[in-house]
Amino acid sequence: MIERGKFRSLTLINWNGFFARTFDLDELVTTLSGGNGAGKSTTMAAFVTALIPDLTLLHFRNTTEAGATSGSRDKGLHGKLKAGVCYSMLDTINSRHQRVVVGVRLQQVAGRDRKVDIKPFAIQGLPMSVQPTQLVTETLNERQARVLSLAELKDKLDEMEGVQFKQFNSITDYHSLMFDLGIIARRLRSASDRSKFYRLIEASLYGGISSAITRSLRDYLLPENSGVRKAFQDMEAALRENRLTLEAIRVTQSDRDLFKHLISEATDYVAADYMRHANERRVHLDQALAFRRELYTSRKQLAAEQYKHVDMARELGEHNGAEGSLEADYQAASDHLNLVQTALRQQEKIERYEADLEELQIRLEEQNEVVAEAAEMQDENEARAEAAELEVDELKSQLADYQQALDVQQTRAIQYNQAISALARAKELCHLPDLTPESAAEWLDTFQAKEQEATEKLLSLEQKMSVAQTAHSQFEQAYQLVAAINGPLARSEAWDVARELLRDGVNQRHLAEQVQPLRMRLSELEQRLREQQEAERLLAEFCKRQGKNFDIDELEALHQELEARIASLSDSVSSASEQRMALRQEQEQLQSRIQHLMRRAPVWLAAQNSLNQLSEQCGEEFTSSQEVTEYLQQLLEREREAIVERDEVGARKNAVDEEIERLSQPGGAEDQRLNALAERFGGVLLSEIYDDVSLEDAPYFSALYGPSRHAIVVPDLSQIAEQLEGLTDCPEDLYLIEGDPQSFDDSVFSVDELEKAVVVKIADRQWRYSRFPSLPIFGRAARENRIESLHAEREVLSERFATLSFDVQKTQRLHQAFSRFIGSHLSVAFEDDPEAEIRRLNGRRVELERALATHENDNQQQRLQFEQAKEGVSALNRLLPRLNLLADETLADRVDEIQERLDEAQEAARFVQQYGNQLAKLEPVVSVLQSDPEQFEQLKEDYAWSQQMQRDARQQAFALAEVVERRAHFSYSDSAEMLSGNSDLNEKLRQRLEQAEAERTRAREALRSHAAQLSQYSQVLASLKSSYDTKKELLNDLQRELQDIGVRADSGAEERARQRRDELHAQLSNNRSRRNQLEKALTFCEAEMENLTRKLRKLERDYHEMREQVVTAKAGWCAVMRMVKDNGVERRLHRRELAYLSADELRSMSDKALGALRLAVADNEHLRDVLRLSEDPKRPERKIQFFVAVYQHLRERIRQDIIRTDDPVEAIEQMEIELSRLTEELTSREQKLAISSRSVANIIRKTIQREQNRIRMLNQGLQSVSFGQVNSVRLNVNVRETHATLLDVLSEQQEQHQDLFNSNRLTFSEALAKLYQRLNPQIDMGQRTPQTIGEELLDYRNYLEMEVEVNRGSDGWLRAESGALSTGEAIGTGMSILVMVVQSWEDEARRLRGKDISPCRLLFLDEAARLDARSIATLFELCERLQMQLIIAAPENISPEKGTTYKLVRKVFQNTEHVHVVGLRGFAPQLPETLPGTQTEDTPSEAS
């Protein structure tokens, strides 16, 4: 036996008064005991919330505001929760022993509305050892715990192996899982199902007989018979569809001409607009493509112009930069020319001053010689004067001396004095204070040697003086020359410097002689260097223009290649015009041919459309006119054959219909008259007696009775003998058999059964042999089998007849279509396709246009290449003669070398030019420089000093000699005083003295006169020297200025500078000319770019507008095409012949059709509105909608589902052809589909009986239920009187109301509603339609009335009403009804759920104190018998003997409110055990 699922426990987390509380639920009754406010209702509210987490339903009424018109906003739930995360969880074990924890996470939402957020979830696979509180709480310490959020709970469960956590976004999914796992009894698919479930729980919770339940017990207990209703609805829909089809066929036939006109005009109206939009779209696409091509071309042109602009700007920048450098170079060259000219003028001044200096030098030298001669003469005069003075002085001395030596004594005295004087003089002269006469001899030798040395030195100096005196003037002149050339120098270095200068002068003269050749060579090399630089520039420019770097070795080959290319390009360019002319001529011919084909295309397309229609209709492909005529002959023959076969099939079909009608007679009577005769004779047809014979026995009995199988069995033949007289309305052979119809058997014949046959012995002399018929029709099974086969044959025959009729008509239409085609289109239909030719020619035209564009582009490129090649050849022509220059890599080095040598030579030339004369003058007198010009004076001084030294030495030697000679005189000291005189000697001395004085006077006069002359000569010399120095200084300044100018002032410098300036001027002019050209070209390019930019902007704007228009049109067109394809009207609208009409012609065609359509749809409101909407030119899809609406209208009118073509015109023609056949077929189908009213009544009666039996079975479970005075409870089900009458009429008196059920205008439901109104005219139906009422009457539940009855005391069975029962009795009665509902739900849901699951049963009861102990015991017994769990709440004065009781006490401790819970299991003498699971974190359990 399958165990029923149970609720194990209820867990409340963070509810008001319950932080973490788990209530273990008893298998039967769990009692919550406590005073007011203890938390009983909160606990039950938590259970209900976890069971039905729907905020639209939850409403705990004990919090309802008193006197308010509506309940509290939070419906009593918000106030039962604490802030933060709250949980309510149910721990269950289902029939499969699976533990499932379901629950909800609740959280208060801040705000005035006091809302609560609810999230349902489920946990599967949880081990039994894990308590629910352990899942959702986290212990922080011994006294604190934290509630986990839903995400944290999910993460925690994900870590547990085998545990599945599911969170639900919808209550339906939550309840679906609970139903599948056996937690709830019914699958709650919708909000109404949840509402029923909640109302049941609410009725259980608050007790009593719920009016919401009792008023709608039918919805709770009686299942909906949707299959029967759907069968009726399908039948009615089929009948309605048949009737509508028939009506539509008739209406379509009557509206045939209107529809043809409507189709034709609608097609013209929409197809013209459709093709106009297609043409415009193609034109717009072509325009957009043209715009895009032009845009791309303009972009390419703009890009080319931009590249050109960049190149020209870059070249202009280069030229601007080059112009600056050229201007600087030109200015530098001009300045250089000016400097050269200035230098030349300076050079001329220098040369002029040098000539003046040379002249002054000559005069100065001459004056120097004059001054030197005068000086020499002055020296001689001074010597003569000095000699005269000395002679006078000597004579005076001698005269004095000789005057003293008058006698010997005087002489000796004089000699002694002289000796003393001589000794003193010797001491003084010899600087020998210790000199004595005795040592004088020794000193005499010494001083004589010194005298000899001084004499030799003096002689040497005299020799030098003689030489120096001769070269004195030359030395000064040479020294001045060396100083002039070399600059200031030491006089001692003059000789060496002069020799170096002379040697250098030789080199300088040699170098100066090379100036002109070097200058010519440098000029030549500079010219070659400039040519080389020009060639390099040309090569770089050439490579730049060619876009490739070339080696020098490749230039000649490139030149030949470019010449060959020029030749080939010249030929190509010359032949391009002819080729372009040929292409344009072919293009014009193609255009003319295309125009001709476009005029012929519509006629050919019309012929092809007609030919394609013929091909589609006949399924043949025609390639020539002969095949068309041959096929027309075949059609005529086929038409004749089809007509013959159709007539044969029609005859066979009529025979089958007659046989079916005969076999369909009631009781198996093939003749309807037999039934009337059987009733008349009071008998029964033999076929009706054997109506139940099996299909296997049917052949035997058919053969057994033979022709008498249609006999009538009567009780007594004698009683009908009189009735046979005058009987005319009967078959030709009427068989009558006597027998009891209730116990008739086949013993009336003697029968021998053979193989597949019988022999019937009718009499002794009459036997009948009958074989078993292959198709027996005796008995209902045989007849039905035969009728079924006949029906199948009839279907085949009907289909075949319809096919043949259709084929005949189709053949006839084909014949007419072929005749029209031959008359109108045969001449052009088999010509070549002009559109294919047009496409080919257009492709060729596009190729020609592309070829022309390519040709123009190639021609332009060839011209550009030709020009580039010519420019390249021109550049190469300038480059090739200079290849040797380009290959000369040492030219610049040679120029630098020659420049250096020229600089040296020019420096030498300037040196020679400046100092050549000085060097020429210096060369013959250079030898005089061996003696320093300053040493002449030194030499004179040395000579004078040597002469003085020699004189001194001589005087010293003479003095010493005199001392030595006078050694004897020192002994004449006594004669010193003795004087004597010699008058003669004195007189001679006096005469010589006078002569000497006279000579001295003459010498002095000559000296004075010559000194004046020397002074005059010296003044002239000083003037010349001053003039020379001035000019020399000016010359030096000019030379310094020339050096400062820094240019070579040679003869060709000015010409070279002028040539360089002219070259730079030419380059600058060329550069400026090119720059002006580039500026003009750049301006033109910028203007062209601006024009292209404006054009590009306009093109982009036009292109974007056109593209936007194309895209918009494409979107609309896509919508149109999608609508066209979805509705299958593309073939009708895409008429290719209209593509060759202009937009005005198509618009005119559409307007004409529109005018005709307005008249055609004037009476049809829908089509008129759609047509009015379709007139919007901006919404072409509305025309398609109109066209679709027209065809939809036609389909609705002509029933497209039963014809064999999608062409409305053909459909109308086929409808006319097959109208009678379809009418007959649909009528018979309606008769087969139509269900009899008696069958409907039987179905409803059987359903009612089945449900009454089920309710009776449910009542058996409530027989022993008693509450107070209520001894028993039952559910009474009765059929309403009005509906019972309806059932009776439907089953027995339906013939009286055939006007309702046979009406083609009423469905069966409507006819049923009309019958109900006819039977019950007193009932007001309100605003409900007959269809709605009829559908309600087809639901058996509306036939039943259900009410709850109780057997109470002496009153017997009474209707259970709250007013007639006490509170406890009402509670018990309501609980019984709810148990019945739950059990009914389980029975109903058993087929939807697994057979191995028995769902949990649990109900609530609040305030159970109103029940007495007997009633509570009854509840316990009911729970035990029905395996139901019950949760009841009661104050402290109720103590059930069974189940589990929780004592709840709400306490406040330190401003914290909590509920103290103690769990007890039953009452017994021993101490009850404390229930597991009641220990919590906030409140300990207590046992009592």
Curated annotation (Swiss-Prot):
Annotated spans, Flexible hinge: 666-783
A GO CC term attached to the entry: cytoplasm
Region annotation (Disordered) ranges: 1049-1074
InterPro entries registered for this protein in UniProt: MukB (IPR012090), MukB/SMC (IPR050308), MukB_hinge (IPR032520), MukB_hinge_sf (IPR042501), MukB_N_dom (IPR007406), P-loop_NTPase (IPR027417)
Pfam families listed in its UniProt record: MukB (PF04310), MukB_hinge (PF16330), SbcC_Walker_B (PF13558)
GO molecular function: ATP binding; DNA binding
The entry's keywords: ATP-binding, Cell cycle, Cell division, Chromosome partition, Coiled coil, Cytoplasm, DNA condensation, DNA-binding, Nucleotide-binding
Family matches, as Gene3D superfamilies: 1.10.287.1490, 1.20.58.850, 3.40.1140.10, Immunoglobulin FC, subunit C (1.20.5.420), MukB, hinge domain (3.30.70.3500)
Family matches, as HAMAP family: MukB
Protein name: Chromosome partition protein MukB
Organism: Salmonella agona (strain SL483)
Organism lineage: Bacteria, Pseudomonadati, Pseudomonadota, Gammaproteobacteria, Enterobacterales
Gene: mukB
